[in-house]
Amino acid sequence: MQNRNTFSWVKEQMTRSISVSIIIYVITRTSISNAYPIFAQQGYENPREATGRIVCANCHLANKPVDIEVPQAVLPDTVFEAVVKIPYDMQLKQVLANGKKGALNVGALLILPEGFELAPPDRISPEMKEKMGNLSFQSYRPTKRNILVIGPVPGQKYSEIVFPILSPDPATKKDVHFLKYPIYVGGNRGRGQIYPDGSKSNNTVYNARTAGIVSRIVRKEKGGYEITIADASDGHQVVDIIPSGPELLVSEGESIKLDQPLTSNPNVGGFGQGGAEIVLQDPLRVQGLLFFLASIILAQIFLVLKKKQFEKVQLSEMNF
């Protein structure tokens, strides 16, 4: 009887362990699949190199345009829009991780001046929220609140991304001054060609690792190819693995050179970076400017009135 109870207890514990393991696996797998923009953040403390190059270009190799629109000047403690535009042909389809074709996604990285940050939800107007859509922005690092990232998100819906930005107040932040500041932006459309660990994705061209003769091409059951090349120097076999996605350009018996493309380049996306300038304007300076302009207008009005008065006096003297 005691042995039976022991067996039941062991069976129950094993069932619980397996259930917990499955739950952990599902949660972990979901987190990883949804968190790949984080990988770039983990690799670089600062996303902008000393040369000015944004590190996203290390994975997205093709060069494409990106644009940003910000106000020329903003007042302290004010919420404004930074609009990042990532243009591309909406008819294009990209190679997905499973080798099939699908719509392009987009992403953006916005590097603001120190002190500028994402506006809190209670400061964002309903009109701006409508322009933002259902986007969820995040800081590049908890300590770098002036650097914001977003993506991947559907490109057909978010080829223009509206960032709600809160300007700093020099009255409360002593390290912020009323100056002109640069803003940097990077934007990509489509998947990258290189993963953060340096390995290739299936969204790039694959080249021959040796010169020789293509002796065998095997189409793999789950997609992709296994290409065997007989080395031209000593005849030893070199096997190149091609994932599902790129189209094969070579055939068996063909003579190829070192680094010759074995596949087409399926990439239709790319990365671009740009910048803009924004002035953190002193309200007193604005008031002074308005007072100066008002004084000029009043002076012009008085000048016109004085001129008309002089003309009347002159006309009356002539009549006299």
Swiss-Prot record:
Pfam families: Apocytochr_F_C, Apocytochr_F_N. The keyword Transmembrane helix applies. The chain crosses the membrane at residues 286-306. Residues 1-35 form the signal peptide. GO terms for molecular function: electron transfer activity; heme binding; iron ion binding. It is found in: Plastid, Chloroplast thylakoid membrane. GO terms for cellular component: chloroplast thylakoid membrane. Binds 1 heme group covalently. It is a single-pass membrane protein. Heme binds at residues 36, 56, 59-60. The 4 large subunits of the cytochrome b6-f complex are cytochrome b6, subunit IV (17 kDa polypeptide, petD), cytochrome f and the Rieske protein, while the 4 small subunits are PetG, PetL, PetM and PetN. The complex functions as a dimer. PANTHER family: CYTOCHROME F, PTHR33288. This is Cytochrome f. The lineage of its organism: Eukaryota, Viridiplantae, Streptophyta, Embryophyta, Tracheophyta.
